[in-house]
From Swiss-Prot:
Binding residues annotated for Zn(2+), in chain numbering: 65, 67, 245, 326
A Gene Ontology BP annotation from the UniProt entry: adenosine catabolic process
Disordered: annotated span: 1-34
Active site (record annotation): 248 (proton donor)
Gene Ontology terms for molecular function: adenosine deaminase activity; metal ion binding; N6-methyl-AMP deaminase activity
Name of the protein in its database record: Adenosine deaminase-like protein
Function recorded in the entry: Catalyzes the hydrolysis of the free cytosolic methylated adenosine nucleotide N(6)-methyl-AMP (N6-mAMP) to produce inositol monophosphate (IMP) and methylamine. Is required for the catabolism of cytosolic N6-mAMP, which is derived from the degradation of mRNA containing N6-methylated adenine (m6A).
Residues that bind N(6)-methyl-AMP: 67, 114, 146-149, 186, 218, 248, 326-327
């Protein structure tokens, strides 16, 4: 009997290895086919930006992946500077703020933006203006994310409270858009700091329904597994949605498998998930939705062009994909309308298909999944493709 048991285990291992090799071979074949088609399409139909985006502008849209600091428009930055001229002079002496020409330029903007957002009033202006701009772009549901910071003027608790108050005020000032907050836990954070912030979120949940989720963000080259237990706690004890920045760069795939097995509600970017047989298998098996930011990926050079985006790869396989902006303030041509336009012409999406993507996005929003509020009216607008 023992020999039979060993024999069966060996057979099972061989079968598992064979299945793994088979999946790897199929992925490679699919990838080559996709790349061939993308190359052919690029040669005969390069991406051309049209001035007329009326159809996409007038479409009610859902945004699930937008960072507050990266969404500040030049107009918003100007308003923040004008609110504190002394501070503005200090910042302008230290930094030179220019329109970025590439991703290095984008990253160069963030120290300036973080310096600007050190006071409560600056946070209030930033949130109000960003929500206002998304509403003007006919976004009907927005999850905006930010990482609490401790500054000379605010504690982590102060930062969260200012955010909550700003979102509450926006509900009344901008009733056409449903707005919620995702709190970012940065990969660089000490575990104790991230745990402290999660505790503050728990306290805030007793007073408000503004906070609907937490995310893992920060430098994609860093391993984020030391914070994994906090995301388990966030879901189990706080009832929060979980979204994880994963597989943004090939240089760090170390933490991907562990976070996929956590079965997060959504994945941010996930640019290279399909390049590894096992992570491709897990993503497909669990059908974990992907928040895809086309312009951000092209601008950061993690994808060579729009057609080489992983958007269509996963869409063909039945994995939900959502059109998002990431950092509309610092990445040129990345408003939500422009992202919908680019997705439509790149992947030949019909109006009905775009409506379907919006429906899926709202179904996977944290406010819907965790019964935070009634979204009947928002669903009506999306289903009928109307704004009123």
């Amino acid at each position: 009997m023992p020999n039979n048991s060993k024999h069966k285990k060996k057979q099972q291992r061989r079968q598992q290895e064979a299945q793994k090799k088979s999946r790897a071979k199929q992925i490679e074949t699919d990838k080559k086919n996709d790349e061939f088609l993308d190359t052919e399409l690029d040669e005969v139909s390069p991406l051309v930006i049209d001035d007329d985006m009326t159809e996409f502008k007038n479409m009610p849209k859902v945004e699930l992946h937008a960072h507050l600091s990266g969404s500040l428009s030049p107009e918003t930055i100007k308003l923040i500077m004008e609110s504190d001229e002394t501070r503005a002079e200090e910042i302008m002496k230290k930094y030179k703020l220019e329109k970025p020409e590439n991703m290095t330029g984008v990253f160069d903007c963030f120290p300036v933006i973080h310096a600007i957002l050190r006071k409560p009033e600056a946070i209030r202006i930033a949130i109000r203006q960003t929500i206002k701009e998304f509403e003007e772009d006919n976004c009907v549901y927005l999850e905006l994310r930010t990482s609490p910071k401790e500054t000379d003027f605010m504690t982590y608790e102060d930062y969260l409270q200012v955010c909550i108050e700003s979102f509450e005020a926006a509900k009344h000032e901008f009733p056409r858009i449903k707005t919620f907050l995702i709190v970012s836990l940065d990969r660089r954070m000490p575990f104790e700091t991230a745990a402290h912030i999660l505790g503050l979120i728990g306290e805030a949940q007793q007073r408000t329904n503004v906070i609907v989720g937490v995310e893992l963000s920060g430098d994609p080259h860093l391993d984020g597994r030391r914070l994994l237990k906090l995301f388990v706690a966030a879901r189990r004890f706080h009832g929060l949605g979980i979204t994880i920045h994963l597989a943004e760069v090939l240089q760090n795939m170390a933490d991907v498998e562990d976070y996929l097995n956590l079965r997060p509600d959504r994945i941010g970017h996930g640019t290279f998930l399909h390049t590894d047989p096992y992570t491709e298998y897990l993503t497909n098996k669990y059908k974990i939705p992907l928040e895809i930011c086309l312009s951000s990926n092209v601008y950061s050079k993690t994808t060579t062009n729009y057609r080489n985006s992983h958007f269509n790869y996963w869409r063909k396989r039945g994995v939900p994909v959502f059109i998002c902006t990431d950092d509309k303030g610092v990445i040129p041509g990345a408003t939500l309308t422009e992202e919908y336009y680019k997705a439509a012409i790149t992947f030949d999406l019909s109006t009905e298909e775009l409506i379907g993507i919006n429906q899926d996005a709202l179904l996977n929003s944290f406010a819907y999944k965790y019964n935070v509020t009634d979204l009947t009216e928002t669903f009506r607008k999306i289903n009928n493709n109307v704004l009123d």
